[in-house]
Curated annotation (Swiss-Prot):
Provenance organism: Zea mays (Maize)
GO cellular component, one term: nucleus
Subunit field text: Monomer and homodimer.
Chain residue ranges for the region called Disordered: 20-55, 68-102, 409-432
Entry comment, domain topic: The N-terminal domain is necessary for dimerization.
Binding positions (Zn(2+) 1): C105, C110, C127, H130
Entry superkingdom: Eukaryota
Organism taxonomic ancestry: Eukaryota, Viridiplantae, Streptophyta, Embryophyta, Tracheophyta
Leftover remarks: A single Lys to Asn substitution at position 6 is the probable cause of the transition from the hardened fruitcase surrounding the kernels in teosinte to the cob that bears naked grains in maize. This substitution is not affecting the DNA binding site specificity, but increases the stability of the homodimers.
Annotated protein name in UniProt: Teosinte glume architecture 1
Signal peptide segment: none
Gene transcribed to yield this protein: TGA1
Gly residues biased stretches: 409-420
């Protein structure tokens, strides 16, 4: 199908020219159309079939008329009518906008300008003066401003001289105060102290396996308890305490008396046996005895018997325990010193026979003129451990009962006190 482009273009241009020429003489009709458009009504051109009506333009988009055909006076009138329809809202003195910018104080009769106050006071509608006043009138009731709640409360909800209400203060204190721990009683705290360390118990506990009168303390890791039943003349058994470890010569220098001895007391300065007190104390503390030796440097230990004690043994030997090797020690009593003359007493035996359990460890020597015997022991070699001698009051046999065991080995010298065949022997003792 062929199109005649020239004929079609000529027809369109001719139609437009005819419409423009017909619209020019009818300017009054266009003014009426412009006034109708200003009032909101749409002007429609007359139908093309009507007599004397111009034909509608085909390029019109029907947006209110053709702009180029509208005169200037009609446009101004339309703009003035549209501006008169938009009237601004009048803002009175008590308008909402003004109230949001400058709120007034909630206290009755207050005319303070909150515009000059801080944002806190403007937000809560209270002036700075009334926020700290003890009593204010709000809505006819006496109230007070709470600085924690930032609200007005009745006076009954406040404590005396408090700026916050009682309810808010209770929650504030619970959040910020920690619970206080229970205070310890000073008396029980001091009573539980033992030495340089503290014990959770006010008094040492007694165990069922301990003998009567024996007490265990933290200061006594080497607390040894043994019983020495004497012969027929002995009336009771005495518990003796031996403390090993670092020797402390303070007792010997100061000459202290130890009241734990039930049948007699000994002063370490003079070595004199004192009379026993009327009532022996129930608690027998730990005793650290022995002065360092001048020759060997080992800490000495002492054992005390009950009746007729007239001599104090000053021996520079140490008690051999489980830690000592079995083949490096022997039993030896190097010397016995008379407390008054301080002379060696090895020539005067005082113990007729020393028995441990039922076996005799030392043969009984011949009795001397004094009627006393001493156990025969070999001379100590270098590195040997020595045992303290135990003094007896009479010629009867003295036996020592122990609860544990410790070994005494035969030295290289092989004296009478060593066991047969060079094997180690066991000596029972109590280790608490």
């Amino acid at each position: 199908m062929d199109w005649d482009l020239n004929a079609a273009g000529a027809w369109d241009l001719a139609e437009l020219e005819r419409d423009h020429a017909a619209a020019a003489p009818s300017s009054g009709g266009h003014a009426a159309n412009a006034a109708a458009a200003g009032t909101g009504t749409e002007s429609r051109p007359p139908a093309p079939g009507a007599a004397g009506a111009p034909a509608e333009c085909s390029v019109d988009l029907k947006l209110g008329g053709m702009g180029e055909c509208e005169p200037g006076a009609a446009r101004r009138e339309r703009e003035a009518a549209a501006g008169a329809a938009k009237r601004p809202r009048p803002a009175g003195p008590g308008g909402q906008q003004q109230q949001q910018q400058c709120p007034s104080c909630a206290v009755d009769g207050c005319r303070a300008d909150l515009g000059k106050c801080r944002d806190y006071h403007r937000r809560h509608k209270v002036c700075e003066a009334h926020s700290k006043t003890p009593v204010v009138v709000v809505a006819g009731r006496e109230m007070r401003f709470c600085q924690q709640c930032s609200r007005f409360h009745l006076l009954a909800e406040f404590d005396a001289d408090k700026r916050s209400c009682r309810k808010r203060l209770d929650g504030h204190n619970r959040r910020r105060r920690k619970p206080q721990p229970d205070t310890m009683a000073s008396a029980s705290f001091i009573a539980s102290q033992q030495g340089t360390r503290f014990s959770p118990f006010a008094h040492p506990r007694l165990e069922a396996s301990w003998p009567p009168g024996v007490m265990k303390t933290e200061e006594s890791p080497y607390h040894i308890t043994h019983q020495i039943p004497l012969g027929s003349s002995s009336s009771s058994r005495q518990q003796h305490f031996v403390a090993l470890g670092a020797a402390t010569p303070a007792y010997a220098k100061e000459g202290r008396r130890f009241p734990f001895l039930q049948e007699g007391e000994i002063s370490f300065a003079t070595g004199v046996v004192l009379e026993p007190p009327a009532a022996a104390p129930a608690c027998q503390p730990l005793l650290r005895t022995g002065a360092p030796s001048e020759s060997s440097g080992a800490g000495g230990s002492k054992m005390f018997s009950d009746q007729g004690l007239a001599r104090v043994l000053d021996s520079d030997c140490a008690l051999s325990l489980l830690s000592a090797p079995a083949n490096s020690s022997g039993i030896d009593v190097s010397r016995m010193v008379r407390p008054t003359e301080h002379v060696p007493m090895a020539q005067q035996p005082v113990v007729p026979g020393l028995q441990f359990g039922s076996a005799s460890w030392f043969p009984r020597p011949q009795a001397s003129t004094g009627g006393s015997f001493v156990p025969s022991c070999p001379a100590a070699v270098e590195g040997e451990q020595q045992l303290n001698a135990v003094l007896g009051p009479n010629d009867s046999e003295v036996s020592m009962n122990y609860g544990g065991m410790f070994h005494v080995g035969g030295g290289s010298g092989g004296g009478e006190g060593s066991s047969d065949g060079g094997t180690s022997s066991s000596m029972p003792f109590s280790w608490q």
